[in-house]
Amino acid sequence: MHGLLLAGLLALPMNVLAHPAEHHASNVLSRRGVDIDSFRLPLKAKYMDNEAAAEKIQALSFTKDDDYVSTATKLVKSTFPKSTFRVVDDHYIGTNGIGHVHFKQTAHGLDIDNSDFNVNIDRDGKVFSFGNSFFTGEIPKENPMVKRAFSDPVKALKGAVKALSLPVKSDNAKAKNVAGKETVEFMGTSGALSAPKAKLVYLQKDDGTLALTWRVETDVGENWLLSYVDANNSETVHNVVDYVASAEYKVFAWGLNDPTEGNPTSIRDPWTDASPYTWNSDGNTKYPTTRGNNAIAQDNPTGGSQYLNNYRPQSPNLIFSYPWSATATPPSSYKDFSITQLFYTTNRFHDLLYSFGFNEAAGNFQVNNGNKGGRGNDFAIVNAQDGSGTNNANFATPPDGQPGRMRMYNWTTARPNRDGCLEAGIVIHEYAHGLSNRLCGGPANSACLNALESGGMGEGWGDFYATAIRLKPRDTKNTNYSMGAWAANNPKGIRAYLYSTSLQTNPYMYTSVNSLREVHQIGTVWASMLYELMWALIEAHGNTYSANPVFRNGVPQDGRHLAMKLVMDGMALQPCNPNFVQARDAIIDADRALTNSANKCTIWKAFAKRGLGYGAKYDSRNRTGSNQLPPGC
């Protein structure tokens, strides 16, 4: 099958945008007078890197007959012999040969929802590294299921609606039991995009105790929330997780970052082996429009939740060639071009990430997984010119098996207004939220980047991939990049500092996080470190500037793609809701697994330059910086 796509920003350069660092995110909850950050989950995770894990497991007994799940289970049992837990059904073996197994702690048969254990098993069947946030306090003696010592879930729904000012009408709500212990779906409501749900779970609190809660799930479009409502006092909401990663971007793109960097060109059959059905088929149906196995792209001028019957360009011969002009106005006048561009960028990034290991088993976004593992029926729903907002974009990442949802907005920062779909960097940044949320904590758990610091890293990963993809052959380590300059109509972009290896141009250090209270600010610090890492690896291995990496024994042969691969592998190794130190250690472990630590000192030097060296320590209020290198470097 042949397809001809006319894409305005086709070589895929990348930038990610958000409002200036001094501005706080203005998501829908905050516009309703609710500070979502005040409900974030606390950081609880610990991470045992490869070196520490090797010492820890010497006393443990494993047999050659153990498969990687059994080995991981033995480790959890030996570490917490008095705890009960279950194996989460999302384990898989990554392309680097590391097996990833995830566990959820339980009490009285109920999940402790923020108590997770992840174990990474190497090619030889040995424990490679692990992390956990298991609860170590006293489990309540009484089983709440015996005396039914908890409130009606309808009260919990109403409590969440009231406390968070949700646009959900729940006066006539009724709870209907569905599969799972104390799991319900609410009938008779309106205002949410799908029927709200609730599940009875325990929650670790900051004071070291457990709270019995109803985990109320409400998808209201701009926010897709898990609200932990106290099961005995429905007016108390302990914590909130938001599946939607939102930013005040001012936009981005691949090879070409935005319309200032080139002109639209026609590209024939751009898919790779990552898309065996091509981009316009799911293996069962061939679509003469911007729909396929990986994504479905359409306009959404009303900002509504429906998408299947929305407008898409049609082309029976699969030639998607449409006019565009920088002076055209309004953006709806070139919606065919915009939808095609969004479809192209989303699919192109899907294929690149697949080559790094974000495949079916790892929880990627596809309808048809071709019997390769994971849960299917979850392509990315990507809306162009979405009318639910302006000067923004967001991506909702539910667990594997449910579609991701991207909303791309128009920008009123210039005349004529600009369309965020034409900056691939924004699209890439948003899709990267799907990547990090599916990998961190496992494909079945989308709540592992909701603490302030881990959420900040989620923003930073988006910036990193957007910037790495937009590099040009003329670039050197002295090249600086802004974020969202085109969409923001501001040459300085939307971050507090340019991404730069110069400490004069970008002075952010690890200890800078001590004074930052917003995820995009923290994300800029993390992305600044990853920018250092990328250039350090480019200096060591060169840069092909090719659109696709060249692998040898599974290792990208240039520094830019190697950095992207190691950063992604680190996401799958680190614990649920990691901090900077743990994420750094996971990247170092990723290099050990992939290259036998060939880049260990290069990686350490990059992080140490910005204060995340060997002696750096995490404390939520007083992080300690270090420029030290470990022995041997």
UniProtKB/Swiss-Prot annotation:
SUPFAM superfamilies tied to this protein: Metalloproteases ('zincins'), catalytic domain (SSF55486)
Propeptide residue range(s): 19-246
Q: Which cofactor does it need?
A: Zn(2+)
The EC category is hydrolase
Catalytic residues identified in the record: E430
Its primary localisation, in coarse terms, equals secreted
Presence of the UniProt keyword Transmembrane in the record: no
Q: Which gene encodes it?
A: MEP3
Any idea which UniProt keywords this protein has? Answer: Glycoprotein, Hydrolase, Metal-binding, Metalloprotease, Protease, Secreted, Signal, Zinc, Zymogen
Record's cofactor remark: Binds 1 zinc ion per subunit.
Instruction: Please name the Pfam families in this protein's record.
Output: FTP (PF07504), Peptidase_M36 (PF02128)
Gene Ontology MF: a single term: metalloendopeptidase activity
For binding Zn(2+), which residues are annotated in this chain's numbering?
H429, H433
Q: What does this protein do?
A: Secreted metalloproteinase that allows assimilation of proteinaceous substrates and probably acts as a virulence factor.
Q: Quick one: a GO cellular component term? A: extracellular region
Residues carrying covalently attached carbohydrate according to the record:
N232, N410, N480, N622
- Determine the domain of life of the protein's source: Eukaryota
Record GO biological process: proteolysis
Q: Protein name, please?
A: Extracellular metalloproteinase 3
Lineage per the UniProt record: Eukaryota, Fungi, Dikarya, Ascomycota, Pezizomycotina
Which residues, if any, are the signal sequence? 1-18
Q: What is its EC number?
A: 3.4.24.-
